[in-house]
């Protein structure tokens, strides 16, 4: 884990400038969630509008919304593909994102252009540098 001030950045993940993370699993699917920075900026998360299974998403488009006591924030897809699973646990316990932002994934995507799109994402070290610039 890399620490940037009060924020934690998990190594081995890919990151966007909008503070989403992507974890490539052994089977080639991708888990998506929001970063420690994002959950701290949002405050206590009250509701996660999970995407529909079967939804086709494009990198950079809205995947779902996360509602906190402060604001409603859009979560963008870090990769393109089909949503094949969602973390139903977040329907009942959205605060899990606050408790464990890198464990509480939101959706699993079957990517359709992974190799190219990963080149456009940041690794943990680059994302940590990006956080320092904010």
UniProtKB/Swiss-Prot annotation:
Question: What are the BP-aspect GO terms?
Answer: glycine decarboxylation via glycine cleavage system
**Which residue range or ranges hold the Lipoyl-binding domain?**
29-110
- The keyword Mitochondrion appears for this protein: no
Q: Which domain of life is it from?
A: Archaea
Task: Identify the keywords attached in UniProt to this record, alphabetized.
Answer: Lipoyl
- Give the Pfam families listed for this entry: GCV_H
Q: What's the cofactor?
A: (R)-lipoate
Keyword match Metal-binding: no
Which residues get modified to N6-lipoyllysine?
A: 70
* Cofactor note as given: Binds 1 lipoyl cofactor covalently.
Which residue windows are transmembrane per the record? none
This protein's GO CC annotations:
cytoplasm; glycine cleavage complex
Q: Subunit arrangement? A: The glycine cleavage system is composed of four proteins: P, T, L and H.
Classification via PANTHER family: GLYCINE CLEAVAGE SYSTEM H PROTEIN, GLYCINE CLEAVAGE SYSTEM H PROTEIN-RELATED
Which family does the record assign? Belongs to the GcvH family.
What's this protein's function? The glycine cleavage system catalyzes the degradation of glycine. The H protein shuttles the methylamine group of glycine from the P protein to the T protein.
Protein name (record):
Probable glycine cleavage system H protein
Source organism per UniProt? Pyrococcus abyssi (strain GE5 / Orsay)
Source taxonomy lineage?
A: Archaea, Methanobacteriati, Methanobacteriota, Thermococci, Thermococcales
Q: Which gene encodes it?
A: gcvH
